């Protein structure tokens, strides 16, 4: 959105961003929203109750390691159309929602937004997928959902290093190094995510120490953010600002701990 664009100067080519969150906060949905915002030139504005122009259509690839393609497609259409995802899943639409869904589906079809599944991936798989997107579709924006270990990547790392039982933090750090290298090598923007460790529940400061598996991942990123549910203390602190400006109460807060 415009606020984060102001902080980071947008999705810059040759830059590697990391946005982490606890389970269930919405890492995938936030990433899908960003991918659609870059690749699609229209979006339904609920406040204006009409479709509005959304800039240019930039070639974008969304790489999923957990979600199925149909799940991702549903989330994309829900975001573009402004229709509750539950309505798409149940087929029970309110007035004019079906027309918006049909229009959003056509918009998505005509946009340079490509989805690739990598359920059990290696570093070579990630690299090949990005390179294929660049070669076949001139992709400039890459969304990788999300950094974690897999059996295939553990086997690959063991084979390359000759070291058995390599710690998870080392493997995750190696993935982040390769992703940053790909940013520079192919002049693309990459956004990825990680889970948070349990310390986020009691933390007073939200930074790389909350990243699950390896805080060293943050060494290679150009922007680091943590998404959390807004607490009652947060809402209390914002109460005056919300009332004075007529803002809606936020459900999510974002802490930016690195920005270069």
What residue ranges belong to the model's regions?
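Phosphate-handling catalytic cores of nucleic-acid transaction enzymes
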Residues: 1-13
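Cytosolic-facing regulatory segments adjacent to core modules
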Residues: 5-6, 41-138, 208
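Pre-Walker A (Motif I) flank of P-loop NTPase domains
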Residues: 12-17, 58
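Structural motif
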Residues: 18, 140-143, 191, 225
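P-loop (Walker A) phosphate-binding loop of NTP-binding proteins
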Residues: 22-23, 65
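Phosphate-binding/switch region of NTP-binding enzymes
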Residues: 24, 51, 174-260
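Hydrophobic positions on the alpha1 helix immediately C-terminal to the Walker A/P-loop
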Residues: 30-34, 72
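Phosphate-binding/switch loop-helix module in NTP-utilizing enzymes
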Residues: 112-185
């Amino acid at each position: 959105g415009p606020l984060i664009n102001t902080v980071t100067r947008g999705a810059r080519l040759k830059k590697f961003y990391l946005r982490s969150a606890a389970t269930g906060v919405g890492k995938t949905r936030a990433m899908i929203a960003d991918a659609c915002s870059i690749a699609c030139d229209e979006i339904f504005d609920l406040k204006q109750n009409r479709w509005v122009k959304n800039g240019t259509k930039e070639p974008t690839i969304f790489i999923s390691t957990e979600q199925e393609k149909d799940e991702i497609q549903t989330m994309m259409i829900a975001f573009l159309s402004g229709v509750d995802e539950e309505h798409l899943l149940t087929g029970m639409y309110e007035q004019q929602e079906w027309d918006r869904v049909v229009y959003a589906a056509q918009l998505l079809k005509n946009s340079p937004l490509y989805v690739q599944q990598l359920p059990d991936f290696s570093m070579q798989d990630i690299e090949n997928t990005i390179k294929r997107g660049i070669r076949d579709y001139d992709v400039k924006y890459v969304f990788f959902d999300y950094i974690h270990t897999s059996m295939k990547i553990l086997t690959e790392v063991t084979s390359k290093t000759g070291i058995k039982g390599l710690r998870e933090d080392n493997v995750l750090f190696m993935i982040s190094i390769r992703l940053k290298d790909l940013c520079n090598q192919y002049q693309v923007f990459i956004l990825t995510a990680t889970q948070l460790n349990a310390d986020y529940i009691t933390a007073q400061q939200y930074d790389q120490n909350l990243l699950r598996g390896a805080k060293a991942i943050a060494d290679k990123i150009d922007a680091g953010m943590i998404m959390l549910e807004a607490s009652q203390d947060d809402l209390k602190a914002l109460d005056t600002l919300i009332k004075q400006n007529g803002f809606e109460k936020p459900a999510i807060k974002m802490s930016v701990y690195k920005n270069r």
